[in-house]
Regions:
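Terminal helix/beta-alpha structural elements that buttress the NAD(P)+-binding lobe
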Residues: 1-26, 33-70, 75-76, 81-314
Length: 314
């Protein structure tokens, strides 16, 4: 099968196309013939950092990146009862760990998958995996979002942000989304009640009394967001470590500032399937690249200007 491997961290030129045997599956896995996969900022950040590769893959080299996929089951482990051959499934597999999704065939834990709704494409399904799960686990699992909450979503036109906006509206929250001016209509179409152009206005001067903030941008945004959150509110950061002084500053104002790291979840990906099947959540796929264009897809994502999601079609 075709696969893309990485021997060491570096630029996109380090992504190498190879022919390797199809993976063997264990008793709790299925073999998936991949129709589409999705890439996220973690893909290029891992590709370019030996430290990140070590954190996710240990000493294994070469590695195969990728966690988000949609495709058809062509092999079943003996313990798998929830799926059958030829079922179309999707999911974020083995995150944070060794997903190996940059390949024509992938061995995936059955517990990380859901049946793909018949009314959405493989591309839409693959898009709605890591980014959807990140938004869901941040806002719902950890943020405890509820009807009437005033929610501020930074980067509302991005992969995580555009799902977060839709999720927040599903919970009947009042949603404020930040993005560039050119993506204003997209953010509002996703359900935001108010849009803030971050280039023209400091959000601190535009909003106050926020219950819940989702921050997929930077730690400095955490610091600035403290100024607009009401006592008892939450700021959720999805990019990693938070400066201790920001956590202390938030604590002094009775604000809970913390990081959330997405993880593979069968129940959550089945929630995604249900919401997509009902049309409540929609994936916005802004660009589709072929498997042979993976390097170009990484470069596009690295611009930081992608609206919605980038998908690779096989």
């Amino acid at each position: 099968m075709k696969a893309i491997i990485l021997n060491e961290a570096g630029s996109v030129s380090n992504l190498k196309y190879v022919d390797i045997p199809k993976p063997e599956i264990n008793d709790d896995e299925v073999l998936i013939k991949v129709s589409a996969l999705s890439i996220n900022p973690v893909d290029y950040k891992t590709r370019s950092s030996e430290e990140r590769i070590n954190r996710l893959f240990g000493d294994e080299r070469p590695v195969i990146l990728g966690w988000d996929l949609s495709g058809t089951i062509v092999g079943l482990g003996k313990n798998v009862s929830q799926f059958k051959l030829n079922d179309e499934v999707f999911g974020m597999i083995n995150y944070r760990g060794n997903g190996k999704a940059y390949a024509e065939y992938v061995a995936a834990p059955a517990s990380h998958l859901a049946l793909k709704p018949e009314n959405i494409s493989h591309q839409e399904a693959a898009a709605g995996t890591l980014a959807f799960l990140t938004a869901w686990q941040a806002l719902v699992t950890n943020g405890k979002i509820k009807e009437g909450d005033k929610v501020l979503i930074h980067g509302a036109s991005g992969g995580v942000g555009h799902y977060a906006t839709q999720i927040a509206k599903h919970f009947k929250a009042y949603v404020i989304g930040t993005s560039s001016e050119k993506n204003k209509e997209f953010v509002l179409q996703n359900g935001a009640d108010l849009h803030i152009d971050y280039a023209k206005a400091d959000f601190e001067n535009e909003v106050s009394d926020i219950d819940l903030v989702l921050n997929p941008i930077s730690d400095e945004i955490n610091n600035r967001s403290i100024n607009v959150v009401k006592p008892g509110g939450k700021i959720i950061y999805i990019l990693g470590e938070i400066a201790p002084e920001y956590v202390e500053k938030a604590k002094n104002k009775n604000i809970d500032l913390f990081a959330v790291f997405v993880k593979s979840s069968g129940p959550d990906i089945n929630t995604a399937a249900d919401l997509m099947q009902k049309g409540i959540i929609k994936s916005h796929v802004s660009q589709i690249f072929s498997f042979d264009e993976m390097k170009k897809a990484h470069l596009q994502l690295e611009t930081g200007r992608t609206v919605g999601k980038i998908v690779i079609a096989l």
